[in-house]
Swiss-Prot record:
Belongs to the peptidase M20A family. N-acetyldiaminopimelate deacetylase subfamily. PANTHER family: N-ACETYLDIAMINOPIMELATE DEACETYLASE, PEPTIDASE M20 FAMILY MEMBER. It catalyses: N-acetyl-(2S,6S)-2,6-diaminopimelate + H2O = (2S,6S)-2,6-diaminopimelate + acetate. It comes from Streptococcus pneumoniae (strain P1031). Keywords: Amino-acid biosynthesis, Diaminopimelate biosynthesis, Hydrolase, Lysine biosynthesis. This is N-acetyldiaminopimelate deacetylase.
Length: 376
């Protein structure tokens, strides 16, 4: 039987960033091959650093998918744990070591007997940086294994052990990276009339773009436009030629995200025209679409967990953070949910360390749900 705690600790020590999860993939394949030995209804494929494990059903009517992410973050770990990261500057600070371990535990249970329906376990790379789910889908990695329904979870530090939280609509917002560069004309600070100050134009843009959310977004829906980087100039007495802004757009629906993206671009171009200068606007959403749960499937999952002993189900509001499972859920109906890990430190914090008792709870809960879906 798989030692969940040791497996998690092994994985925790080898975090790797997206599409570089070579040790992680090797470790996972070793475990998967041991678990699936002698199971003639199992097939395994790899895609770059990702893994797909397909359990052929005995009388399949559909394919049920379970997705886990496998990448770490470029963070220096500060937990002080004896099994801390052995990779300098890399850490499993978002709980993907837990996600992988739970998926392996569920795979082990699913292999106890051939399921009626097909089951697909997806070990997806590059959730954090390259939207690996989108890359796999667009590259045809699923082939005829593409699920009819897709499920997944994410650990959440501010929920207690035994709590599961989701809803029947949006769980994560869609995110879009924004880069804007204004280009004017540099010059001496004493002669502003001979220059065209990009810093002034960029500053004007930052104030004007605030109207996008306040005047273009339905207040019931909500959206966020934040610029966290503003770079302009190198010294006090020189008017800068260029100004660079780097920010993010977040919205509950893809339609709203596209509207906000359009308005941000329009405001930037309008400001540039008003100041008679050039502007470059780069909008990069990629696969980070809103994670929109299928209402009927979410209701089914919520009812299932609500009746499970030891589980407290919470109907939760959307999170303004992003998650690339949204892309796959834009192609396949499915549900994502939160699993409580009761940590005082937030996701992506260098001291984030979940409670390991969650592993057994997660495996028991998820495997029982997948068993139900596989038998329908």
């Amino acid at each position: 039987m798989l030692d969940l705690i040791q497996t998690r600790r092994d994985l925790h020590q080898i975090p790797e960033i997206g599409l570089e999860e070579f040790k992680t993939q090797a470790y996972l394949l070793d475990v998967i091959e041991k678990l699936t030995t002698g199971k003639d209804f199992v097939q395994i494929r790899t895609w770059r650093t990702g893994i797909l494990v397909y359990l052929q059903g005995s009388q399949p009517e559909r394919t049920i998918g379970w997705r886990t992410d496998i990448d770490g973050l470029p963070i220096v770990e500060q937990t002080g744990l004896p099994f801390a990261s052995q990779h300098q500057g890399r850490m499993h600070a978002c709980g993907h070591d837990f996600h992988m371990t739970i998926a392996l535990g569920c795979l082990e249970r699913a292999l106890e007997e051939q399921p009626k329906n097909n089951l697909l376990f997806l070990f997806q790379p590059a959730e954090e940086n390259e939207a690996g789910g989108m890359l796999m889908y667009e590259d045809g990695a699923f082939g005829d294994w593409l699920p009819n329904q897709f499920y997944g979870l994410h650990v959440r530090p501010d929920l207690k052990v035994g709590q599961i939280a989701t809803n029947t609509h949006t769980l994560f917002v869609g995110t879009c990276e924004v880069k804007i560069r204004f280009k004017g004309k540099g010059g001496h600070a004493a002669f502003p009339h001979e220059a065209n100050d990009a810093l002034v134009a960029a500053s004007y843009f930052v104030t004007q773009v605030q109207s996008v959310v306040s005047r273009n977004v339905n207040p019931i829906e909500g959206a966020v436009v934040t610029f966290g980087v503003f770079q302009a100039g190198t010294t006090n007495n020189v008017i800068t030629e260029t100004a660079f802004l780097h920010g993010t757009i977040r919205a509950l629906t893809q339609d709203m995200s596209l509207l906000v993206q359009k308005r941000v671009k329009t405001v930037a171009e309008g400001v540039a025209a008003a100041f008679d200068m050039e502007v470059e606007v780069e909008l990069k959403q990629g696969g980070y679409l809103p994670v929109e749960n299928n209402p009927a499937l979410a209701r089914e999952l919520m009812d299932f967990f609500d009746e499970k002993d030891g589980i407290e189900l919470i109907d939760i509001e959307p999170a303004m953070t992003g998650e690339d499972f949204g892309y796959l859920l834009s192609k396949v109906d499915g549900v994502m949910f939160w699993l409580g890990i009761d940590s005082p430190y937030a996701l992506h914090h260098p001291q984030m360390s979940p409670k390991e008792e969650v592993l057994a709870i997660g495996v028991a809960a998820v495997s029982s749900f997948l068993k139900k879906k596989a038998a329908e």
